Each structure stands twice: as structure tokens, then as C-alpha cells.
């Protein structure tokens, strides 16, 4: 007997890939259910807290501002104290001073430098941090390198412009340029003269050839007339010669 042929079907639930898909869907549904349950418990606790505050203060207008902020989870926006992050900020300041070269390792280890632990507001802290950020940007070595590269590029560009201007001036002032111009002008004049002389010579030759042609034509016509007359004279009789 062969095995179950339905196992070869893609829709069969006995296949491992279908079982894996089913398990993943069940896990997603379970996670969503847990999130909803946790949120409902949180809302339930907030409602109980609000009821206790109402019982304690009575009217909502009598509730102090700090308690209202705690209920709305807005107390972190108005908390000016930095008791929790005091030690971390001190260590961060020391690290920044060491990286910027303002403090040596010996002083850090000995602890001779006095650290001001005065509490300040967040507004003052933000202003001081922005000023320190500007100073750090100005003292950044990468930015310095970039500025030096820009200066070098600008200097090379300016030097190229000056060199091109000097070249043009030297070309204008060079005597060879003027001599070349005079030579070119003289060549043009000589070419024009040669062309005019050639044209005049060609005109003369044409007139001579036409004169020769007319002379040849006249000579041919005269010879024809003379031959005709000779023929007429030959046809005369001796008596006509005598009378003539």
C-alpha cells in the first residue's frame, strides 16, 4: 500500500510548513491578546487612582498641579532636577574635555580639578550645550582640513586666472606678433596685385587673340575674292581681252 497521497497536497494540515504557519498565527494572536490585557489593566489602575484623588481632594479644582501632571504622565516635561543623570553628565563632561585636549590624564586620575555640581535649569543647559556644539564644530579637525582644501583650491584658481591674463598681455606686447601681422598684410597685398596683373594679362591676351582672328578672317575673305576674280578672268575670250 502506498502512503497517504494527500500529504503531497499543498493544503494538507499534516505538512510541516502548514503547521508552522498555524503556529505563527497563534503566537501573533496571543501577543495581541496580552497587549490588550496589559493596556486594560493600566487603564483600570489609572481609574482607581483618579477615584482615590477625588476622594482625597473632593473637587477637581482643588487638585494640585503636580498631581494632575502625574495623572496625565506629563511630569517629565516639567522636571528641572537632574539628580538621576548627574553622575553620567559629569563623566560625559570629563570625557569631552579629555577628547578635546583640555584635560590631561594625570589630572583626571588625581582628581585635583574641582567639578561644579550646581544644579541649573534645562533652558540654561540647552543654551550651554548649543554653545559648546558651535565650539566643537569650529575645533573639528575634519572641518579644518576641509577649509584648508577650499583655500588651496581658491588660491590655485586665482593663480590660474592671473597666469592667463599675463599670457594675453605678453602676446599683445610681443614684437613677433606685430611682425607676423605685417607679413600677413603684405602677403594679402601681394596676392591681390598678382591676381590683378594676371587678370590684365588675360584681358590683353584675349584682345590679341580676337584681333588675330579678325585678321585671319579678312585674309581668308580677300583670298576668296581674288580667286573668284581670277576665275572670271580665265573665262574671257581673246577678243574680249583685246576690246578690254
Curated annotation (Swiss-Prot):
GO BP term, pick one: mRNA splicing, via spliceosome
Localization: Nucleus
Transmembrane segments: none
Assigned keywords, A-Z: Coiled coil, mRNA processing, mRNA splicing, Nucleus, Spliceosome
Cellular component annotations (GO), alphabetically ordered: U2-type spliceosomal complex
Residue stretches in coiled coil: 27-57
Chain intervals with Basic and acidic residues compositional bias: 215-235
Biased composition (Polar residues): 127-139
Biased composition annotated in UniProt, kind: Basic residues: 164-181, 203-214
Pfam family, one: CWC25
Main location: nucleus
Residue segments, region Disordered: 125-244
Assembly: Associated with the spliceosome.
Biological role stated in the UniProt entry: Involved in pre-mRNA splicing.
Family membership: Belongs to the CWC25 family.
Protein name per its UniProtKB record: Pre-mRNA-splicing factor CWC25
Lineage of origin: Eukaryota, Fungi, Dikarya, Ascomycota, Saccharomycotina
Amino acid at each position: 500500500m502506498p502512503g497517504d497521497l494527500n500529504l503531497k497536497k499543498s493544503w494538507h494540515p499534516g505538512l510541516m510548513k502548514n503547521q508552522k504557519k498555524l503556529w505563527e498565527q497563534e503566537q501573533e494572536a496571543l501577543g495581541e491578546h496580552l497587549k490588550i490585557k496589559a493596556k486594560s489593566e493600566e487603564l483600570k489602575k489609572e481609574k482607581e487612582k483618579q477615584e482615590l484623588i477625588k476622594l482625597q481632594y473632593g473637587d477637581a479644582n482643588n487638585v494640585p498641579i503636580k498631581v494632575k501632571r502625574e495623572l496625565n504622565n506629563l511630569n517629565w516635561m516639567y522636571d528641572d532636577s537632574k539628580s538621576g543623570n548627574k553622575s553620567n553628565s559629569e563623566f560625559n563632561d570629563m570625557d569631552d574635555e579629555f577628547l578635546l585636549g583640555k584635560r590631561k590624564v594625570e589630572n583626571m586620575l588625581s582628581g585635583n580639578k574641582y567639578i561644579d555640581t550646581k544644579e541649573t535649569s534645562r533652558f540654561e543647559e540647552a543654551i550651554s550645550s548649543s554653545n559648546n556644539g558651535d565650539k566643537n564644530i569650529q575645533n573639528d579637525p575634519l572641518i579644518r582640513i576641509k577649509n584648508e582644501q577650499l583655500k588651496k583650491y581658491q588660491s590655485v584658481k586665482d593663480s590660474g586666472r592671473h597666469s592667463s591674463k599675463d599670457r594675453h598681455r605678453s602676446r599683445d606686447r610681443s614684437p613677433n606678433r606685430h611682425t607676423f601681422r605685417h607679413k600677413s598684410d603684405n602677403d594679402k597685398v601681394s596676392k591681390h596685385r598678382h591676381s590683378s596683373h594676371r587678370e590684365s594679362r588675360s584681358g590683353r591676351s584675349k584682345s590679341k587673340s580676337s584681333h588675330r582672328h579678325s585678321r585671319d578672317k579678312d585674309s581668308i575673305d580677300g583670298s576668296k575674292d581674288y580667286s573668284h576674280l581670277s576665275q572670271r578672268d580665265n573665262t574671257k575670250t581673246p577678243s574680249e581681252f583685246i576690246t578690254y
